[in-house]
Swiss-Prot record:
It holds the Pfam family Glyco_transf_28. Gene3D superfamilies: Glycogen Phosphorylase B. This is UDP-N-acetylglucosamine--N-acetylmuramyl-(pentapeptide) pyrophosphoryl-undecaprenol N-acetylglucosamine transferase. It is a peripheral membrane protein. Cell wall formation. Catalyzes the transfer of a GlcNAc subunit on undecaprenyl-pyrophosphoryl-MurNAc-pentapeptide (lipid intermediate I) to form undecaprenyl-pyrophosphoryl-MurNAc-(pentapeptide)GlcNAc (lipid intermediate II). Its EC number is 2.4.1.227. CDD domains: GT28_MurG. Coiled coil: none annotated. It comes from Rubrobacter xylanophilus (strain DSM 9941 / JCM 11954 / NBRC 16129 / PRD-1). UDP-N-acetyl-alpha-D-glucosamine binds at N102, R144, S172, Q264. It catalyses: di-trans,octa-cis-undecaprenyl diphospho-N-acetyl-alpha-D-muramoyl-L-alanyl-D-glutamyl-meso-2,6-diaminopimeloyl-D-alanyl-D-alanine + UDP-N-acetyl-alpha-D-glucosamine = di-trans,octa-cis-undecaprenyl diphospho-[N-acetyl-alpha-D-glucosaminyl-(1->4)]-N-acetyl-alpha-D-muramoyl-L-alanyl-D-glutamyl-meso-2,6-diaminopimeloyl-D-alanyl-D-alanine + UDP + H(+). Disulfide bonds: none annotated. GO terms for cellular component: plasma membrane. Keywords: Cell cycle, Cell division, Cell membrane, Cell shape, Cell wall biogenesis/degradation, Glycosyltransferase, Membrane, Peptidoglycan synthesis, Transferase.
Length: 336
């Protein structure tokens, strides 16, 4: 979304948390970042009181910054880190948009959606979950264009991989159960390559004696890894699912099981019900099951092709442009 806005001549500035991944990723992408001291609302009364105080201070800080920056529009993408800027924009009458990535809206987006100019959703069903009083539209999930343009031959060459290729990716936060199962499942020799992207937290605990099993902490060029793969094992985060859809690959989805609203399970079902992915419940993940499911898909080329085609049909290549165009139009009008 930020790249689409910048290409249209807009200056893009991020507001985020001092402790979030954005502290590293946003400047690396060439965008300005105002990092705010924030804390989640988990914990006891003292922790919640501190979080509320930090939030109030962050709103005051955001209000001052927005007065200085004078943006045409503000976009909130959910989570407590986006809430102060959205609240400050509301107070100043700046047009505010919300993008909801998941099938089930989060608390911050539910609250912010009531006063947003428009709520833009990745999954069609999410629009109705905001209620009739909220103006919501399905635009899809903004996805980096590299996922749409990457070449498999180039990806295999760059990564030094021999097909077939299995990619195991737990998302930015990792996934311990999946990581441990994969490290065990693909030991010894395999007639296929395995790339396992573990995340920072789990990486020190993992190893493999399989020369075709590569374990990485992080992959900046994740689009090359998805493009190189024949089968992808992922969590049910919206970003990961739509990244795989952009490339068009058969996927085994292991939703994170501890969200109160089954957010990742519902995300995954959108794809599994359309024949684009298979569901593997988290509690069923072990080395034997994971390897069996992967090899079953690798051994059925026709099925993989059908799944890949269905997955690709669910991609939303114009989502970022849709968001950018709506924000720029609101900025030109200049009213909240």
């Amino acid at each position: 979304m930020a790249e689409s806005l910048r290409e249209r001549g807009a200056e893009v500035v991020f507001f985020g948390s001092e402790s979030g991944l954005e502290r590293e990723l946003v400047p690396k992408a060439g965008f300005g970042l105002h990092a705010l001291p924030l804390s989640g609302l988990a914990g006891g009364p003292a922790s919640r009181a501190r979080a509320s105080l930090l939030f109030a201070r962050a709103v005051v800080r955001c209000r001052a910054l927005l007065r200085e920056l004078r943006p045409g529009a503000v976009l909130g993408v959910g989570g407590y880190a986006s809430a102060p800027a959205v609240a400050a924009a509301r107070l100043l009458g700046i047009p505010t948009f919300i993008h909801e990535q998941n099938s089930v809206p989060g608390k911050v987006n539910r609250a912010a959606g009531r006063f947003a100019r428009e709520v833009l959703v990745a999954f069609p069903d999410a629009a109705r979950r905001f209620g009739r009083a909220v103006r919501a539209a399905h635009v899809g999930m903004p996805t980096r264009r590299q996922f749409f343009s990457a070449s498999r031959e180039e990806a295999l060459r760059r990564l030094g991989l021999e097909p077939p290729v299995v990619l195991v990716f737990g998302g930015s936060g990792g996934a311990l159960r999946i990581n441990l199962a994969a490290a065990e499942a693909f030991r010894g020799q395999t007639p296929y390559s395995v790339v396992q992207i573990s995340g920072r937290r789990d990486f020190p605990r993992l190893s493999s004696d399989n020369p075709r099993h590569r374990i990485l902490e992080y992959a900046e060029d994740i689009w090359h890894h998805v493009t190189a793969a024949d089968v992808v094992v992922i969590r049910g985060g919206a970003g990961s699912l739509f990244d795989v859809a952009a490339v068009g690959r058969a996927a085994i989805v292991v939703p994170y099981p501890h969200h109160r609203d089954n957010q990742q399970l519902l995300n995954a079902r959108y794809f599994t019900e359309r024949g684009a992915a298979e569901l593997l419940p988290d509690h069923e993940v072990d080395a034997k099951t994971l390897r069996g499911r992967v090899e079953e898909l690798l051994g059925d080329g026709e099925r993989r092709l059908r799944m890949a085609s269905s997955m690709r049909s669910l991609a939303t290549p114009r989502a970022a442009e849709e968001v950018a165009e709506r924000m720029l139009a609101a900025g030109r009008e200049g009213t909240g």
